[in-house]
């Protein structure tokens, strides 16, 4: 029976350290500030943004939410980002994704000044991460790495299998574990025999958005399973892993909700504090 990794608890203890850091910066007359831009009325995005605001307030950080209507022009958004780039009181800029179809996501990410890119999506941040240079790391991958380390799971020399290749989680999380000397395999929708791959994993990270994709027979006994999926099925949140069955095989597993999610926001706060220094 697996140990269920309590992401809320790990996040909470990390946030206490961040709170002390904010207090120390305030003594130096620095008030860390995160500005979030939300376009449109997407319910999931609204909920994420509320979570970010609440977490920022809890540690004493300033958080500013700019709401824009769905029909906002791309040029207007880019102009706003330009203004925030030039505003010395703003340390972190986050544009909540996904964006309306008429706005080019890449253009928007590229427009954010790299020194304020607290999401870690700018090509400068991604490039630095690739070569192992200090930079803003993407929040969910960094949260996963922190969780695994916090549970004292050895990483160097272990086989990490990542299911999913998104720019936000899949690709970067593999790179972070590679930088920690793990052997990393990527799987995706075109992988021929997914189960044959996942059964080799000492650490299995699943981030595809397909409910219960990973079943117990696809998991190596005593593996550590990190479920990044968030899917709504019959009004309930479930991950990409068949939790109850896999729990019987794995040594550790993250639940959904309450696993990776709280760490994502915590790493966003961490990045904003680093940007303020």
Curated annotation (Swiss-Prot):
NADP(+) binds at residues 164-166, 189, 230. It comes from the Bacteria. GO terms for molecular function: methenyltetrahydrofolate cyclohydrolase activity; methylenetetrahydrofolate dehydrogenase (NADP+) activity. GO terms for cellular component: cytosol. The keyword Amino-acid biosynthesis applies. PROSITE patterns: THF_DHG_CYH_1, THF_DHG_CYH_2. Homodimer. This is Bifunctional protein FolD. It comes from Exiguobacterium sibiricum (strain DSM 17290 / CCUG 55495 / CIP 109462 / JCM 13490 / 255-15). The gene is folD.
